[in-house]
Design a protein with these regions (language model features):
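Conserved catalytic/dimer-interface elements of ABC ATPase nucleotide-binding domains
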Residues: 38, 133, 175
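Conserved catalytic loops of ABC-family nucleotide-binding domains
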Residues: 147-162
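Conserved structural motif at the start of ABC-family nucleotide-binding domains
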Residues: 4-6
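ABC-family P-loop ATPase nucleotide-binding domains
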Residues: 50-146
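H-loop (His-switch) and adjacent beta-strand-loop-beta switch element
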Residues: 170-178
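Conserved H-loop
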Residues: 163-170
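ABC ATPase nucleotide-binding domain signature region
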Residues: 13-76
Length: 178
């Protein structure tokens, strides 16, 4: 299926852009192209600055490594201070002793908290967000929203969603993908 043909788009730095579209419109594929985790069949993608992996994405964590080991691994990939990121994620994700247990033993909520903590512990110029879903109890949701809003004071974001309301709340620009 062709997702974009002859497409040219500019996402300005420091701006939160929302992409709205129905299922199958190509929103997530476009995010993968921007992230560099997928290649276009023709043409090219030009990015400037540090672009995040999709915020909260836990799919690349190794199931047999602990939360701390996975965090250390990601820190090394991104050239971050490993000790600082581990301390940040341990405090932020509220995993207690589970942070030192294999990732495969985590509940879905624990996996999401670890992934979101790692995402927020790394500084990017642009954050990529594919269908934000709030995880955890009310206190964790509030803490997550606050830290994310803090990040957006110094960075931009590209959001994809089905939810018009969510995009209106978080974005300063937008487009509809057909």
């Amino acid at each position: 299926k062709t997702v974009a043909c002859g497409m040219n788009a500019v996402f300005p730095s420091g701006i939160s852009v929302g992409l709205l579209g129905r299922n199958g419109a190509g929103k997530s594929t476009l995010l993968k192209l921007i992230a560099g985790s997928a290649d276009p069949t023709s043409g090219h993608v030009i990015t400037n600055g540090r672009i995040s992996f999709p915020v909260g994405f836990a799919g690349s964590f190794h199931p047999d490594m602990t939360g701390a080991q996975n965090t250390r691994f990601v820190a090394r990939i991104y050239g971050a201070d490993t000790s600082a990121l581990i301390d940040y994620v341990a405090d932020f994700a509220d995993l207690d002793i589970h942070f030192h247990l294999p990732f495969r033993t985590y509940s879905a909520g624990m996996k999401s908290r670890l992934a979101f903590g790692v995402s927020m512990g790394l500084k990017f110029d642009t954050y990529l967000i594919d269908e934000i879903t709030a995880v955890g109890d009310a206190r964790f949701k509030q803490k997550s929203q606050q830290i994310f809003m803090d990040r957006l004071t110094t960075a931009g974001a590209v959001f994809v969603s089905h939810s018009n309301g969510m995009l209106r709340e978080l974005c300063t620009a937008g487009a509809v993908i057909e």
